[in-house]
């Protein structure tokens, strides 16, 4: 570090260096976004000044007309973007332009693969902001002065690992960014090109974006008068808040461009919902469903929420109070007439209007997803990205549990595919005559679920079973108890009750078999002792010799593993061993002498636990027993 009269050279944070290099190489084909990102930042700076000036309008001084200006110099090869917003202090410059103050940055960078197309999508999803300037320039100079400070600051870097920072005199508040364009990016030092980019990407920005317009006087014969040039400033964007305009006047392209502004995303949203509500609760909302998940989706404490405006005045980004956690992927704005202009995050937690708004916006979001679900392909894209987050809903939002249940999708024996594309409504429509319950099975993965012995009787009878193989699924089902008046039943827990679908002859045969095998059951109970809760004959198996089930209210194996991994102490749970009386191994067990019987009984128990996704406490002994039997 070198220091001289408030001038110093500092190094970029490691993550910034990595991001700069990756971005410069990965985003080359999409490099015109640099202007959108810089204008978006400038608009945010104007919004922040407008908010601070609510309590102190002297901050405007004699310059209350907020604006963004873009100039270019073709000869020098520069593009300048300036605003008269809030500006930055020296500390803010170092913080904002030298570091990435976002949790999960290191993890995000690890996801990058070196494939340009794939990385471009990921980087766009992260939000590159100011650093996008380095896609088109090899040198950037920033001059800024925070509105409440007398001293200005200059920041300068070539994007190679360090930056210079120095105090300067800057009479006007706000920020000016000068991009020194690379040789292959000189095309951007052109008025028409810049206007086109503003109108394409930033037309919806509420702050006027102005560019200089040169006009020349002409004589009576129409010839230009030399030296008569005058420069005026021309507003080149629409400069009105998109959400306050009537829906019928807004094109799909404008909606998509606005989404990219609020979400800092490169890709289009899947759908959106624009509503203006008048009456007891007055608000306008514009909500979006993104087309892909952000890298920090599963950080429940991460940054999320809507942009909050009150009477069109920007109040804050990431206002998380207006949507429940399971809808944290929804992006957009809410503009309320019922909240105070001096509202803060703390006050939002106490304002009864916020709860009403949250309830209304939650309903809007769920209705938007219900509408999206009519387009199966688009909804599948949504589900693949956000399904696991939506599954948090039934536990968090009892009032909307039925609406959320309609939106859930599962794998199923109906398709025997790992793709989660089957709805509960679809399942109910396919239920067999006499079927009273919705059957499901929880496992660690799709293959473990689809090959589970518990499915054998269901496949034989043609009864559909939902296959749940996400980590959250067992927890989900502990809060989702019924759908459309039908109770859910875990096929791996409790007694299997298919009596409603069995004829009298079948029931009678099962009862007789159970009586005939009673001595065998007693022998197995004695052999296994306290390793099992119970041993019984089952008719749920057709191909496997045995399976283990848990009591109806016991915690499943999947949930136990999650709790144990989190360090939670859990009471011991003993399984129930069920034997298939028709299987040759069970017949062999029945005829075995005591020297073989105990080993074979334990092997059947251990195999059933493994098939269920459980873990053996002593796998070495299991292998010894198996080898001993195989060598006979």
Curated annotation (Swiss-Prot):
<keyword id="KW-0963">Cytoplasm</keyword>
<feature type="region of interest" description="A; substrate-binding">
    <location>
        <begin position="1"/>
        <end position="345"/>
    </location>
</feature>
<dbReference type="InterPro" id="IPR020568">
    <property type="entry name" value="Ribosomal_Su5_D2-typ_SF"/>
</dbReference>
<dbReference type="GO" id="GO:0005737">
    <property type="term" value="C:cytoplasm"/>
</dbReference>
<feature type="region of interest" description="B">
    <location>
        <begin position="346"/>
        <end position="561"/>
    </location>
</feature>
<dbReference type="Pfam" id="PF00183">
    <property type="entry name" value="HSP90"/>
</dbReference>
<feature type="region of interest" description="C">
    <location>
        <begin position="562"/>
        <end position="632"/>
    </location>
</feature>
<keyword id="KW-0143">Chaperone</keyword>
<keyword id="KW-0346">Stress response</keyword>
<dbReference type="InterPro" id="IPR036890">
    <property type="entry name" value="HATPase_C_sf"/>
</dbReference>
<dbReference type="GO" id="GO:0016887">
    <property type="term" value="F:ATP hydrolysis activity"/>
</dbReference>
<comment type="subunit">
    <text>Homodimer.</text>
</comment>
<keyword id="KW-0547">Nucleotide-binding</keyword>
<protein>
    <recommendedName>
        <fullName>Chaperone protein HtpG</fullName>
    </recommendedName>
</protein>
<dbReference type="InterPro" id="IPR037196">
    <property type="entry name" value="HSP90_C"/>
</dbReference>
<dbReference type="InterPro" id="IPR019805">
    <property type="entry name" value="Heat_shock_protein_90_CS"/>
</dbReference>
<dbReference type="GO" id="GO:0140662">
    <property type="term" value="F:ATP-dependent protein folding chaperone"/>
</dbReference>
<keyword id="KW-0067">ATP-binding</keyword>
<comment type="function">
    <text>Molecular chaperone. Has ATPase activity.</text>
</comment>
<dbReference type="GO" id="GO:0051082">
    <property type="term" value="F:unfolded protein binding"/>
</dbReference>
<dbReference type="Pfam" id="PF13589">
    <property type="entry name" value="HATPase_c_3"/>
</dbReference>
<dbReference type="InterPro" id="IPR020575">
    <property type="entry name" value="Hsp90_N"/>
</dbReference>
<comment type="similarity">
    <text>Belongs to the heat shock protein 90 family.</text>
</comment>
<dbReference type="InterPro" id="IPR001404">
    <property type="entry name" value="Hsp90_fam"/>
</dbReference>
<dbReference type="GO" id="GO:0005524">
    <property type="term" value="F:ATP binding"/>
</dbReference>
